[in-house]
UniProtKB/Swiss-Prot annotation:
Required cofactor(s): heme b
Species for this entry: Octodon degus (Degu)
Family in the record: Belongs to the cytochrome b family.
Protein name: Cytochrome b
Pfam families: Cytochrom_B_C, Cytochrome_B
Amino acid sequence: MTNIRKSHPLIKIINHSFIDLPAPSNISAWWNFGSLLGVCLMLQIITGLFLAMHYTADTTTAFSSVTHICRDVNYGWLIRYLHANGASMFFILLYLHIGRGIYYGSFTFMETWNIGVLLLFAVMATAFMGYVLPWGQMSFWGATVITNLLSAIPYIGPNLVEWIWGGFSVDKATLTRFFAFHFILPFIITAMVMIHLLFLHETGSNNPSGLNSDSDKIPFHPYYTIKDILGFLFMLLTLMTLVLFTPDLLGDPDNYTPANPLNTPPHIKPEWYFLFAYAILRSIPNKLGGVLALVLSILILMLFPMLHLSKQRSMSFRPLSQCLLWALVGNLIILTWIGGQPVEHPFITIGQLASAIYFFIILILMPTTSLMENKLLKW
């Protein structure tokens, strides 16, 4: 009799995805981030569900309901901070996952990569709308500033903004719809993750060498299940340290002041994980130009398969490209720092330079370096 694991229509799918899945024998810890992101998504959905049970999406009571969760609900403070810092964890893992994809040439799996970029957009939208829900000062003004960017779209812009607001300013209607979207999007993300995995399992995983690994595969369970569990423990340790010792480390103190449409905070800035994009947005004096640069800074990821001119898939054996990638990482760190600074003399210039360098490295330097390395192979 065949094992139920292999014969049952539903369990069979799980078996082919997580148990008997043939995986390359040499994938490193950089391949742990996919499963960590899955765990993070589940954690966010569970904590979010419990928060939604006590939260009220109304401008008069939203801020108080969050306070009530933290003070009066059993372990409400823990659930709230797990959810808030879980988002930061999510983005750390997401950026590492994307970095891994760029370094090892995983973007050559076009379908998987493009679904991944769409996933990034969906997660960013979800995080932005979630930040609006506590209805603090930064929530309100962040929502006002970011939604206002859509007014830069020619002809339909102003109408579009009012349509999204549900009125002539960010108000009750905006908060209610943002809560609805923030609730539904993670489930859409979960469905997209399944498609992401479906496409990945069509081709099989990439590996650090960038070479075909069909001749040397091992079963996912127990080898990589145990390796993933180690990753979960590290992630949990980091997250719990953050939540239990410094829960407000990554937050903005302004968000502990209830939203006041009559008082603008001195520095409006998003959460840390959006600062690099915010810096790119601010570095262009023109509104529409800034919005385009902002969208392109993420959308540029879709161009990676086209910009890949090297004869080798992975960067493992390409030291010059490695240097460029690490320069890009450094540049992104500088952009993140600039995004959190006021719009004043040295920061404006640094931001503009870093933004230009960001696009220059990806669009010009990386492809030309790849061609040069191809030449060096013959030399």
